[in-house]
Amino acid sequence: NMEMLDKFDVYPSTAETPSVLHYTSGTTGKPKGAQHVHYSIISQYITSKYSLDLKEQDIYWCTADPGWVTGTSYGIIGPWANGVTQCVMDAGFTAENWYSFIERHRVTVWYSAPTAIRALMKEGEAAIKKHDLSSLRYLASIGEPLNAEAVIWSEKVFGMKFHDTYWQTETGSMVVSNYPCMKVKPGSMGKPFPGMEVGLVDIKTHKYFDKKGVVGVIAVRPGWPAMFRAYWNNPDKYNEKFIDGWYLCGDRASIDEDGYFWFVGRDDDVIN
């Protein structure tokens, strides 16, 4: 009741007070705890608003488990900060379950993973035609590169493309994405989120370069609110991620003549 709320003591905190600890295995070594702070909500709010195109009247479904960084950042914090109604599904994955869920709750914005999207592709159009999915207006993906075939398929069966996004546990929010106002190039990661400086550094020297079509390591200038502040009890590993004023994502990509990023693979070429 309200009387209990009035007596509840809120722990004093600032924008830089630690708020979330997300564990990430990366590709090598033991899992590392990426520590984020309260200030992260600014990045998650603004990227949810402009990359996922969330509006107050939307019914939003992020299919990620809340124990995963996407399920926290974009399944809880970002959409809540935008005042958006969210749906949570507690059932196993089948095309029938998912399409029924979208139809029943009139989902308008759907954020999912490429693996799930490809599984839906295998189920075919017949599964889609059983349901009224006309409420959908915006589709986005995260978790791994979204292949061009999946983007083309989604436009055919849903009447709209999936917008791929790119970020990591350590970045805390989207770094590169296909946002609503830009043309989607199937298979591309998109472009850097406005206000973030994202580029490529040489694979061997880690020096920044600006050459179209040349593969390098994705790097981000530190300073965005959701950037992780530490690896829990592992300062040496944290410091290794920053070289010459850049945070190194550890992923390789190229940039085309229009500024679109194209994922190539992990820098260490190891599959976890």
Annotate each predicted stretch with a short phrase.
Residues 2-23, 30, 53-59, 136:
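Conserved pre-ATP/AMP-binding loop-to-beta segment of ANL
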Residues 10, 95-99, 128-130, 239:
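Short hydrophobic/charged patches on amphipathic alpha-helices used for structural packing
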Residues 10-13, 187-193, 210, 241-245:
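Short Gly/Pro-enriched turn/cap motifs at secondary-structure boundaries
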Residues 18, 24-27, 60, 102, ...:
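Conserved S/T- and glycine-rich ATP-binding loop of Class I adenylate-forming
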Residues 42-62, 66-109, 119-123:
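Conserved AMP-binding/adenylation subdomain of ANL enzymes
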Residues 210, 219-272:
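Conserved ATP-binding/catalytic segment of the ANL
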